[in-house]
């Protein structure tokens, strides 16, 4: 009888892909099968995020809950970015945890499950040529890593300390994985990296000198690929070559994540982001000009140390000019191992909270007018998910979530949809034809 694996995934799309790799290793090469029932699992894994402080604080209460609910003899393992930076401390605080596996050590999962109190958190471990097995949480799209780690030194970010220096995965391995995904039914390819458009800079072999724009073109030339998405690009590397490929390649989805973080050049300098307010606006407005239908999302941190009212006003100015379709906004969260946590002039929580509320309220007002303009437009929607009430949901090329009345027969299909009911976060429509 097979052992049962329960896994909970927190955080970003890269964690989703890491969990897929773990599941593949254990279900295809070890005697495990996946379960959604915590209490019947023989192995319980939590794949963690450490970008902000709150999820880290929740970790120990969560694994304590798992320990109470698990069946006798079941093992608990902690994986991911929090595992990388806390390491042995996790087992010291929670001795019922069987092992700790860092974000850069996914390929070691089969070894650590056979050890007691193993801690594998080497952020210099090279997984770039590791031949991951096939497993996808969605039959309709494939998450594919194109790089591992990050070579940026943003002063607020712990990721370089949990995922290590950036290494680009060889293009031939990426294309091989894309072909396998297409052969097993995926029509949408989602390329992943901390800074995808920095791809290729780690290659020392000149014969392999491929940048992200080249890689996009190569992926798009594979038969069976209908759509290409990617996250997360860095504004600093949004050169004209990249924007031109984005605008003209019909397989590249017209949605772009542009992490602003702050609209103040002074704050951006303190964050070590490498660009200015003016650079960001130039890239965003050029993108709007080249691709009028583009959907631009962003990340914004408010309350970064030293952020004045004038600095915050600069952020609001960028928001009003770019009119982002989606904003992921947060109060600054001091992280261990980052320079910004020791900066002077930390912003009081009540000030950061006020700024966050103002930003979020402003964006909600914008969304009302942005979404209203979608009414009566016709989009091609790729349906991926059943929703309550007899609805099926999918995404447009430019990343609107659209739901229509329908059945599971729509799943995995591209259909034309006329938008009948705009909404802030999603649209409703009806099938055309």
From Swiss-Prot:
Catalytic activity: N(6)-dimethylallyladenosine(37) in tRNA + (sulfur carrier)-SH + AH2 + 2 S-adenosyl-L-methionine = 2-methylsulfanyl-N(6)-dimethylallyladenosine(37) in tRNA + (sulfur carrier)-H + 5'-deoxyadenosine + L-methionine + A + S-adenosyl-L-homocysteine + 2 H(+)
CDD domains: Radical_SAM
Gene3D superfamilies recorded: Methylthiotransferase, N-terminal domain, tm_1862 like domain
Localization terms from the record: Cytoplasm
Cofactor(s) for this UniProt protein: [4Fe-4S] cluster
Keywords on record: 4Fe-4S, Cytoplasm, Iron, Iron-sulfur, Metal-binding, S-adenosyl-L-methionine, Transferase, tRNA processing
Gene Ontology CC annotations of this record: cytosol
Subunit-level organization: Monomer.
Protein name (database record): tRNA-2-methylthio-N(6)-dimethylallyladenosine synthase
Source organism of this protein record: Nitratiruptor sp. (strain SB155-2)
Gene name, Swiss-Prot/TrEMBL: miaB
